[in-house]
Amino acid sequence: MSHSANFYRLETRLQSLTGKAIGDFGMIEDGDTVLVCMSGGKDSYTMLSVLTALQKRAPIQFKLIAMNLDQKQPGFPEHVLPAYLKSLGVEYVIVEADTYSIVKEKVPEGKTTCSLCSRLRRGVIYRTAKELGANKIALGHHRDDIVNTFFLNMFFGGKMKAMPPKLATDDGQHIVIRPLAYCAEKDIASYARAMAFPIIPCNLCGSQENLQRKKVSEMLQAWERENPGRIDNIFAALRNVVPSHLADTDLFPFTGLATGLAKIDEASLFGETTFTQQALTFTGNVEANRMEFVRFDKIQKVQEAPERASEPSA
């Protein structure tokens, strides 16, 4: 397969960002067995491709096992993923579980199936990981998914909550990782097209995208078109949280604040832009001191005046 210089720059960027995310969050360690969840979409194909490339030159030893869940959807091309994974020479497992029938039975026609489908898949994945001895489970969510989920939870759930790049399962037996956490969806889509991955559409939810998620995604894309780099800035904000400037009493001891104890950026308390500036201080009785606010150029003139007065006259 012949690729251009632009493709190799794209591939290098994806591998570099994935490697950085793995390092920043300690996602993969020496001796790990990682279950790589394959849905047949662009994200999971890209994740497997990048992880296998990193595995070859990593300074540690870890094992990758690709997994696909055959949910018994009508018309599902069950031969596609096994043939592709076999051509790569990677270890893989195809798990058959008829979650499709359960979802269609439980969810009324026209309603979104994503929530129930996700819970059922999660249960099968955890069980498979345990059976295979995999201590890490890799999912293909990327930067845009994380930012999108953050706004969904804020707008419709009243929580500042996103998708963590790494978390422990409720039973504490597995660690779920998202190696593509730093990667932009547009880069993943470009890479998938260039690699000509055999994409498998989802018949359960592909034609009935969650309306709320779609609206949030459209909003973010509009912001990005208006101000390129905005999604990057939002994601950066998720990694640069200042609890003292939010309103969650579980994250910051507001009730324990007292004079002489807290070191808080006072400028931002009044809605000002945070910047570093040398401050004036005074001691003594506050009642006995008068404070006058003057322009910086006037301060400069006042400081220079005594020097000019001391100069000898001609």
UniProtKB/Swiss-Prot annotation:
A single GO BP: tRNA thio-modification
Record's keyword annotation contains Mitochondrion: no
GO molecular function annotation: 4 iron, 4 sulfur cluster binding; ATP binding; magnesium ion binding; sulfurtransferase activity; tRNA binding
Cofactor(s) the protein requires to work: Mg(2+); [4Fe-4S] cluster
Enzyme Commission (EC) number: 2.8.1.-
InterPro entries (alphabetical): Rossmann-like_a/b/a_fold, TilS/TtcA_N, tRNA_Cyd_32_2_STrfase
Amino acids binding [4Fe-4S] cluster: C114, C117, C205
Superkingdom: Bacteria
UniProt cofactor note: Binds 1 [4Fe-4S] cluster per subunit. The cluster is chelated by three Cys residues, the fourth Fe has a free coordination site that may bind a sulfur atom transferred from the persulfide of IscS.
CDD domains attached to this UniProt entry: TtcA-like
Pathway as given in its UniProt record: tRNA modification
Catalyzed reactions: cytidine(32) in tRNA + S-sulfanyl-L-cysteinyl-[cysteine desulfurase] + AH2 + ATP = 2-thiocytidine(32) in tRNA + L-cysteinyl-[cysteine desulfurase] + A + AMP + diphosphate + H(+)
Residues spanned by motif PP-loop motif: 39-44
Record localization: Cytoplasm
Pfam families for this protein: ATP_bind_3
Reported function: Catalyzes the ATP-dependent 2-thiolation of cytidine in position 32 of tRNA, to form 2-thiocytidine (s(2)C32). The sulfur atoms are provided by the cysteine/cysteine desulfurase (IscS) system.
NCBIfam families: PRK10696.1 (NF007972)
Subunit structure: Homodimer.
Extra information: The thiolation reaction likely consists of two steps: a first activation step by ATP to form an adenylated intermediate of the target base of tRNA, and a second nucleophilic substitution step of the sulfur (S) atom supplied by the hydrosulfide attached to the Fe-S cluster.
Family as reported in the entry's similarity comment: Belongs to the TtcA family.
Protein name: tRNA-cytidine(32) 2-sulfurtransferase
